[in-house]
Amino acid sequence: MSWMLRLQERLLGISPWNADKITDEWFRAHFNYAADLAHDWLGRSLNLSQAKLLNFGCGDGITDLALVLRHGATSIHGIDIRQEYAKLPRIAREQLGMSRIPAALSFETIVPNSPLAGRHAGYDGLLSWSTFEHVQRDKVLPILADLHACLRPGGVFFLQIEPLFHSPWGSHLRRYDDVPWHHLMASEEELWNTIEKHEGPLDAAEVDFGFADFGADGYKRFVFKEYQALNRLTADELIDIARQAGFEVLREERRHVDMPIPEALQGRYPEDWLRNNEILLLLGKP
């Protein structure tokens, strides 16, 4: 199928698209902001028009689509444990008016924690957007080591996590609970009660394309299970594990919030943990 798409694209070009058609805020954020940030971090080291890229935790593939359409990427293979990317042709049609997605994109579903390097090697660049906080803690090192083996010498890896667990909305539950740091002060039962009782519309930018699959109540259960499974890594721990996996840190940015810390949390956690909302890393393979 891939060769047929490439032949069609060679004859007809990439399907026309129009960003003025975008109506979905989740799509807009990942098509614009996420893709621009990934391009900024990868594009300083790689020519995306020539690079072979792998996206670990690609989700619905919207950011990959934008990297092709807006930033000239020509080869991105997305990997995920779910099949949200299967919706991308429909999403691209609805949000951009595209008749088909670019042949530069390919996707694959994997079993959690399964090794990749045996069949995926020689990549120029890797990216991972808000994925590693969901990886089982004792699997972070072997997965990073496996991704290191997927990368060619001199290749780079853009890794981002937001929000980090100890930050104000590190629970990933903000669509239902807007109280900063509530997850560090309340019991799981109290948190679940808050979510379960939530009524009314959600922030459109927080509603992904999987919401309809679960329904309102099912989605509440899904995101709460995701919260319970968070590995609670700090930025320092992530960097230390990345180095253990063989990476060197080429660039690092930590973004912090400026807001009062609740008295109940003062002294319980380092202030930097509580304020550090996001970590962005460019890792290199020597």
Q: Positions of the model-derived regions?
A:
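A short acidic, Gly/Pro-enriched loop at the edge of an enzyme's catalytic core
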Residues: P115-L126
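Core SAM-dependent methyltransferase catalytic element
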Residues: A245-F247, Q266-P286
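A short glycine-rich, Lys/Arg-flanked "PGG" loop and its adjoining helix->strand segment in the class I
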Residues: L141-P153
